[in-house]
Amino acid sequence: GYNLAKVVLNLLYRVTVDYQDEAALERIPKRDVVVYAMNHRSNVDYVVVAYVLAYGAHVSYAVGEWARVWPLEYVFKSFGSYFIRRGFREPLYHAVLEQYVHLITKNGVTQGFFPEGRLSRDGRLGSPKLGLLDYVCRTMLDPAFDRDIWFVPVAINFDRVLEDRALIRELVDEPDRPGRLAQLWTVMKYLGSNAVRLVTGRLKRYGRAAVNFGTPISLREWLASAPGVLQLPKEQRLPQLERLAALLMERIGAIIPVTPVPLAAAALLSFGQTMIPKAAVLDRMDQLRDRLGAVNAKVVRGGARIREVWDRAWRMLRMRRLAVEEGDSVVVLPRGRPLLEFYANSIAHLLPIRSPRVPFHKTHEVDADLPRLRRSGEDGGGRGR
């Protein structure tokens, strides 16, 4: 899977990797089991983590059945994935799945899973699901299993999520809701078009894909503070495991990478107006970056000049037609607001400034107060698309 991941990512992003406590990761005993718990931003998450961990470990993922089509089935199997039916209620199926998870855990297989259980539709971190977490934890009940299990929080963020418009449509209009195959088709189209651009020398990457690894959590230590939890009946056990799931999500949220586009989106939306002086945007970005530094947030290229960070973000905002320049001001286009909210939401929990809520709804694509813009080929012209 490494070679494929490398090709795909080089077509799309510049990858940044950082560690909250690399020494703690290195101290995990080799014989213990490592489980990476990740937030779920994009279907590209699998590829990003496979690429980052290629020389350290092969990771077994739980992937939905939507991926069991050629060539995706081959791709995900090359990353060590197994396929599950999400939302399937058949008890026998879950009994078999639980035994499979126990088997790979007892044999020391490194695993990766997404506690949220689905892609984020609005950009925010979602509530955790408990199924796979419960299965992994209950491996500790096996008398022959004498290892520890370490949960490693992994936070992923992008300057561009390939499926962002499709994800937002799920919150906009029920009849227009795309299926998972439609989302994957969007990703495949991007890969194809970028492959053509690579051959013709016109390749432009979509900014940063950033991955941060957090401080690992020892399951044995956690269970020592909650003795007898795994022996409880399921209806009593799961509420207790919610505390572990919440701890994982808290750790993930604390290390979410702040790439240029989410930072710029948060700054733009914090004003609550359509036209904003560019100097004010840069000042607000600088203020937000200082705040992020104060809470030890992981800011990508945090030492760069704020104008440089803005320029990197602006290339994406302009290319996506989310905003245009009007003299010395930046104008947020109405159709761009939901996408800006999507990216700003990814770091909203780290910031004191809350942008005005802009519901994901079609009525917000028309803004009577938007100034009439001059047409220019580079800006996309008119009132946006």
What kind of feature is each model-predicted range?
Residues 1-385:
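Membrane-interfacial terminal anchoring regions of lipid-handling membrane enzymes
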